[in-house]
Amino acid sequence: MLEKFSLEGKVALVTGCKRGIGKGIALGLAEAGADIIGVSASLALEGSDVENEVKALGRNFKGYQCDFSDRDALYAFIKEVKADFPKIDILVNNAGTILRAPAAEHGDDLWDKVIDVNLNSQFILSREIGKEMVARQSGKIIFTASLLTFQGGITVPGYAASKGAIGQLVMALSNEWAGKGVNVNAIAPGYIDTDNTQALREDSERSAAILGRIPQGRWGNPDDFKGPAVFLASDAASYVNGAILLVDGGWMGR
């Protein structure tokens, strides 16, 4: 049974892998046997922490930089990475941003950047990498969704809209590609101890309210995403399509 979870010989492209959830996923995939292509807006091209940790596991790592809010930069990255890696087996759409402002003050610049990074770039990357997977009749695409795929959030209208759309995109792509050998799914993190939640964790009242709703009684951490990512990237999930896997300590069950 364990061989179904092996990613030996696979190549995984992980966006937003410099730190946090993306780094945790990249390391989990490497631990399962995959070589890693990492890309983030500010990832060091050589010598990054994630590269060093992947290589310490005996796996290969190639780093790229890309500003996912810049359409031209995105297409240039796609052209480069496809030339360097003709066969990408696993795509993890994890790169994202969150910009906070009350809806009445949420300017076009904030809205556009969040939608470009969290939705538009992820569709384009999935389309361009996914078409190669469809041609081979084999591939795995994993999106990072959110609790706000299901809930509205507070003072993050662009983020909530983008993550709600990701839930629909996962199902839309799955409807087209599940019968063509490509599994498209998502992981929805709960409240995780990362840079994105620093303001919440430092707000003692808000942090206490959040912890009070999580049945497991703790914030999540990047290591909590290794197992779910390996599962969705592996043959063990060959009949899983269009799913959004909650990794939230039980939050959505309350």
From Swiss-Prot:
The active site is at residue 159. The keyword Oxidoreductase applies. The keyword Oxidoreductase applies. PROSITE patterns: ADH_SHORT. SUPFAM superfamilies: NAD(P)-binding Rossmann-fold domains. It is an enzyme of class 1 (oxidoreductase). Pfam families: adh_short_C2. Its EC number is 1.1.1.127. GO terms for molecular function: 2-dehydro-3-deoxy-D-gluconate 5-dehydrogenase activity. Belongs to the short-chain dehydrogenases/reductases (SDR) family. This is 2-dehydro-3-deoxy-D-gluconate 5-dehydrogenase.
